[in-house]
Amino acid sequence: MRNNLLGNALANIVAANGNKVVKTNIVNDRGIHICKSMLAWKKYGNGETPETSGKKGDHLVGDYYVSFDKHYKAEVKELMAKFTAQGMSGDEAKAKAEAESPLMQEAREMLVKWEAGDPEVRGLWEMMNNWVYAGFDETYKKMGVSFDKIYYESNTYLEGKEKVMEGLEKGFFYKKEDGSVWADLTAEGLDHKLLLRGDGTSVYMTQDIGTAKLRFADYPINKMIYVVGNEQNYHFQVLSILLDKLGFEWGKSLVHFSYGMVELPEGKMKSREGTVVDADDLMEEMIATAKETSQELGKLDGLTQEEADDIARIVGLGALKYFILKVDARKNMTFNPKESIDFNGNTGPFIQYTYARIQSVLRKAAESGIVIPEQIPAGIELSEKEEGLIQMVADFAAVVKQAGEDYSPSIIANYTYDLVKEYNQFYHDYSILREENEAVKVFRIALSANVAKVVRLGMNLLGIEVPSRM
């Protein structure tokens, strides 16, 4: 979730700074993790499909990943008991049990068959992957995230192997006696990096080299920004060096936009234990909470059911996105659903409500026949608060520029909050529609309109909608 929200916001901000941006995604659609789900479905699925189960395809496949892990752990536990009874130490018994687990051996055999192009395995793989892709598409659409191109590891890893062999021929890499291919990065202060295993199978680095090659061929890029968690910092340091060695001009300027882990009050999000915090469930929970909170505060009064549902969606997703994006991406963070949906403080709903409040002012002004001028009327004596608001609005372009230079969506988020906070103080302290001086009234309405415009632009850069009424 944090990955997609950060990547989407970053793409918007970089584009707003005048750059042509291509949004791509890589799906790891091959490997042992896929085979685990496939094998579990084959053994325990009884032909279950998304249609027969009523589940999203990605959820169903995820369930079988969890199923594999549960059966595997039970198998390892049973084998460990057997080996310890034979006199082995706990660590020895565990290592032997994991190595000899029939279930894991079957998964590895399935992977070998996949690599060899076995028709039955490939058919099962295509079917289950299509379930996952359909589920992903639904989630991305709801999240408001899109891509110009999606790459699949199954199509890129061979390109990577080809590029590694090319590097080997040119003397950039070396081969060990077991046939594995390595890069010697000691001159760069790093270690030796495996690029191809002795049996010729690829590693993650191989796939990333292949994907980079395809991106470079598909688009006239001069910079690549990878949005990946901070546990991969070393990986991307190495990838940058390898791409440079292989002749990609932008290799040295590769940017790893590294971000920290998101935790919930209960703990980190996990997958193998069956305690995953699903993005779809989280979005649904946020929308439901937004509706409940908005109703309690009377913010949905007078709206049709359809309008109320749309406001709940906008507020719920806005709360989720803003809470994540306001934090410096490099830091670990704890996501608190209740705190994020508060209509007061540094939250998405507070900003959205202020925007809706300004739209209400502008509607009433229009109903009164007031036309907002393009320029501020002359001869108006401005207060310090009004001058401050004008300056904050004028600062928006510089803020967007800074956010682009620093690759920091949080700069936009916190600027927008500060602007809204100042406007609310202004709204509280000064009459707008009831101001007796007509020129001052028109000025304050125009100022309100400009604040609303900047709030909308800022939130849109973060991928957040703002409602016209609430």
What is the role of each PLM region?
Residues 1-470:
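NTP-dependent nucleotidyl-transfer catalytic core
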